[in-house]
Amino acid sequence: MIYIYFIYLKQDDPKKSTMRKLERFGIARRISPGGARDKLMLTRSADTVLSKNDRFIAERSGICVIEGSWNREDTFAGLRFPYGRRLPKLLAANPVNYGKLEKLSSIEAVAAALYIMGFQDDASAILSKYTWGQNFLQLNKNPLDEYREADPEKIPEIENAYF
């Protein structure tokens, strides 16, 4: 499995943190912001969209996500990460933001990244820790499959076709 890291901002209820749960299962590891420099960083402020071409970065250094509140999304607005990537548009399946565009939980974001880079089994495995997890893959099956096959320059066309 690809190494999964997260930066925990302590902005939400720790009992509801999807990444803290993965940490308890030994699947994810908490790091400081400085520890994310060489990682494939999932961030909405990135200019580059995640694609299958990013697989080698994830295999080499792992994937990192910021675990924080959607209500305080500007926390890292000024920071740039060398391997920062934004996810293509997807719908959330978590109970708090179900059906909302781009309001993914951290575990959904990591699972989407894994799926798009060709690690579908790993994506399914981490989502299995939540009763609603597999709903994310079902809800987004068609766009995820198209993103997985597409070259980076085609992803905006796919986003527009679905959303």
UniProtKB/Swiss-Prot annotation:
One of its GO terms (biological process) is enzyme-directed rRNA pseudouridine synthesis. Belongs to the TDD superfamily. TSR3 family. Its main location: cytoplasm. Keywords: Cytoplasm, Ribosome biogenesis, rRNA processing, S-adenosyl-L-methionine, Transferase. Aminocarboxypropyltransferase that catalyzes the aminocarboxypropyl transfer on pseudouridine corresponding to position 914 in M.jannaschii 16S rRNA. It constitutes the last step in biosynthesis of the hypermodified N1-methyl-N3-(3-amino-3-carboxypropyl) pseudouridine (m1acp3-Psi). NCBIfam families: PRK02287.1. This is 16S rRNA aminocarboxypropyltransferase. It is an enzyme of class 2 (transferase). S-adenosyl-L-methionine binds at residues 18, 66, 87, 106. It catalyses: an N(1)-methylpseudouridine in rRNA + S-adenosyl-L-methionine = N(1)-methyl-N(3)-[(3S)-3-amino-3-carboxypropyl]pseudouridine in rRNA + S-methyl-5'-thioadenosine + H(+). GO terms for cellular component: cytoplasm. GO terms for molecular function: 18S rRNA aminocarboxypropyltransferase activity; S-adenosyl-L-methionine binding. It comes from Thermoplasma acidophilum (strain ATCC 25905 / DSM 1728 / JCM 9062 / NBRC 15155 / AMRC-C165). It is found in: Cytoplasm. Its EC number is 2.5.1.157. It holds the Pfam family Ribo_biogen_C.
